[in-house]
Each structure stands twice: as C-alpha cells, then as structure tokens.
C-alpha cells in the first residue's frame, strides 16, 4: 500500500466505522466521488477497509473510537487482517505509528483471552450464540466469517448448461469449479468483472450464492404451477425458480420496496423470463394478496432477517445489528410466515428461509408456526435433497455455514399443507 492509498483508506474508514451506513454503500459512494482512482487503488482501499471491519474487535481494543483515528485503524487492518509486515510499510509511518503497530503485534496473544475478541464478534452476538453454541463452535464461526467469500454464479438453464459454460470460464483463466451441491452453480475463487462478461450480459450467468440456489431447488417449482415469492427483493431466487419452470406457469413476486422490484425487471429481460408478475405490496396484509388465498402450489418466504449468515460479505452487519433489532425482526417474521401460509393450496408447499444463523430466527420460528398451524407438517430437507440427487444432509432443516459448506450461512424449512 502506498501513501495515497493509505490516505484514501483512512477517509473511507472515518465514515465506515461509524456504522451509520452499509459499508458497501460507503465504499461505492467514495469511489463515485473519486473517479480517477485506478483498479489497483480501489482494490487496496476496499481490501484494507474490509479487513478493518473483520478485525474491528481487536482494533477497537487497541484504539478508542477507531473512526476518530482512521489512519491508525487502516494501519492496524494491514497488520492484523492483511498479514503486512511493519517493515513493508515503514516508509509510511512516523515514530508514533511505528510504536503503535509494534505494540499491536506484541498484544496478539492477549487478544485471544476474551471470546468476543478471539472470535471477532461483538459482545451482544456472543451472548446470543452462547445460548445455543459451545465456545469452540463460536470460535469456528468467527474464523469462517473472517475468510473472504468466493463468487458463486448460477447458470440460467434457459440459456445454457453448466457442463458447457464451465470450460469456457476455465479457458479464460478464471479459477472456476462446479459448486459441490447445486447442479447449476459455478464457484469463482478469483473475482472477475462479471457484469461486463458476455455470458452475464446475455443472461446465461447470474450472481447467486450456492445456498440461494439450493433454496430454489427446495421450492421444487414445476411447469404450469402458481408460485409466490412473498419477499422477492431484487429477485435472485425468483429468477432461479422461473428458470425451473421454463416460462410455463405464473410467478408472483411481491415486495414492499418498489426500488428492489424495479431492479428485478431488467434481470427478467436478460434472463429471458416472461412468466413473472412483480407487484409492490404495502405489507404482508395487503388486500391484493388475498386473491391468491389457497391457490398457490408453492410459496417462498425468504424472510427479512438479521443477515448474520452473510458476514463474510457484510462484516459491518454485526455492528449494525443488535439484540434489540433481532427481537423486532422476530415478530415481523412470524407475521409474514402466517400471512404467506394462507396462500398455500392443499398439498402445496411453503418454504421458509433466512440468511441468519440464529435459532430464534430459524428453527424456533418454524416450531412456533407449526404449533399454531396443525394444517402444516414439516418435510425432511435431507430426504428431499436426496430425491433431487443432491448429496447434502443437514437434517430435517437445511442449515448451511461458511466453514463447512463454503456458502453464506443459510437456513430453510420446507412445510407442506395437509389435505
């Protein structure tokens, strides 16, 4: 890292470490304001800023109010998060900074004393996890989310096949391999400018974590069916389900945010999908939903959640969420799941999912729903995936984690309505 890159990183961290805005939004805004920054500059700034987020527990132990000392925070991130030797950056340092980094390296063993610093997790989250996990499980989780995430992409089966697309990417020197579970997935260990790639522009490829691809498999949409994506967002899972249906049948994509649904429309066009009807709703109780009561073959609820399964990509979330925000989400999730269940026809399927690792948002939410809705029963996810020739057994629920499965942390439950 050179002096100019360090200066830019410090300016980014001064804003990012207040945790008032999503980190990716802060970074994008900064790069828009500094259009002359080259590709390598942006890479160095982004990697160091995200290293500061991943190692914020240790940095905040060494520095009071890191956002008020962003240059030191950036230097600490280089040493703690990017394995930079002090000798490599000695020309950037004054005497005080050299002493600070020397003390920081000397304190590395001290940082392992507290579970929150050892796992790089805030105290509130450690306390939540301690209700269900052992100390070793918490430490393993902390290690897994501090690893950079690969880029997973999905082959749109309307436009191509994985066994044809994969060799093309490998021929371009992309470090590409088939995902181990999803039959449509490709994993890129080295990120490329996919949004400019011909196969992305023509709709053959779509960015999507393997966990989300498996969720689309669990929905099990068939041609000619009525499908509801109750919390569609920008529509990544909607598109995967649509490809399964080959434009035969109808998908209703609902969301409360018009902006997110607006992003779905160009993606539909690029993917060659014509059977998706997107509509903004005011809430899960919107009267426009009532017309589908008891008519849907499949209903997907990718519920609003804490997002704590995505910490590899969004390390700031653990500081932007709290026990209070999670508690508020629980009632919202329950209300949405209850409302969505009314759309499912007899023998139809209701799939509940989150990108959280907290049992309160996951298993406990499903157990509460089943206790209130005896007309539904749980379908074993492992058996369902086995029937789809997916060799993955996480039990009756789909539970994915970054350490074991190299995906985002993910949860799903499949519920079937009885006759």
Say what each PLM segment does.
Residues 1-196, 295:
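Class I Rossmann-like S-adenosyl-L-methionine
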């Amino acid at each position: 890292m050179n002096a100019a890159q360090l200066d830019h990183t410090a300016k980014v961290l001064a804003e990012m470490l207040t945790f008032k805005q999503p980190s990716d939004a802060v970074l994008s805004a900064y790069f828009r304001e500094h259009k002359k920054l080259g590709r390598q500059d942006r890479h160095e700034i982004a990697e160091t800023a995200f290293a500061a987020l991943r190692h914020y527990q240790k940095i905040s132990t060494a520095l009071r109010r890191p956002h008020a000392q962003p240059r030191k925070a950036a230097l600490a991130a280089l040493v703690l998060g990017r394995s930079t030797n002090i000798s490599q950056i000695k020309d950037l340092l004054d005497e005080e900074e050299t002493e600070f980094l020397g003390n920081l390296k000397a304190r590395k063993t001290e940082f392992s004393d507290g579970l929150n610093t050892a796992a790089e997790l805030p105290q509130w989250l450690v306390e939540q996890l301690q209700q269900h996990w052992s100390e070793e499980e918490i430490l393993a989780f902390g290690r897994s989310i501090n690893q950079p995430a690969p880029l997973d992409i999905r082959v749109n089966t309307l436009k191509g096949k994985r066994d044809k697309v994969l060799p093309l990417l490998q021929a371009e020197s992309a470090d590409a391999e088939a995902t181990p579970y999803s039959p449509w997935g490709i994993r890129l260990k080295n990120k490329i400018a996919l949004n400019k790639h011909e196969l992305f522009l023509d709709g053959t490829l779509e960015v999507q974590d393997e966990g989300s691809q498996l969720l689309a498999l669990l929905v099990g949409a068939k041609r000619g069916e009525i499908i509801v994506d109750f919390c569609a967002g920008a529509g990544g899972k909607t598109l995967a389900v649509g490809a399964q249906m080959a434009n035969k049948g109808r998908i209703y994509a609902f969301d409360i945010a018009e902006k997110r649904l607006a992003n779905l429309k160009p993606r539909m066009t690029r993917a060659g999908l014509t059977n998706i009807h997107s509509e903004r709703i005011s809430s899960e109780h919107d009267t426009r939903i009532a017309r589908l009561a008891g008519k849907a073959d499949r209903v997907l609820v990718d519920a609003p959640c804490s997002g704590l399964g995505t910490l590899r990509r969004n390390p700031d979330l653990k500081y932007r969420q709290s026990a209070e925000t999670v508690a508020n989400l629980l009632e919202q999730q329950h209300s949405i799941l209850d409302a969505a269940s009314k759309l499912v026809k007899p023998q139809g399927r209701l799939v509940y999912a989150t990108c959280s690792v907290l049992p309160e948002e996951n298993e406990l939410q499903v157990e509460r729903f089943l206790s209130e809705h005896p007309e539904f029963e749980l379908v074993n996810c492992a058996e369902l995936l086995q029937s789809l020739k997916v060799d993955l057994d996480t039990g009756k629920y789909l539970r994915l984690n970054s350490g074991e499965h190299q995906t985002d942390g993910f949860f799903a439950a499949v519920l079937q309505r009885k006759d």
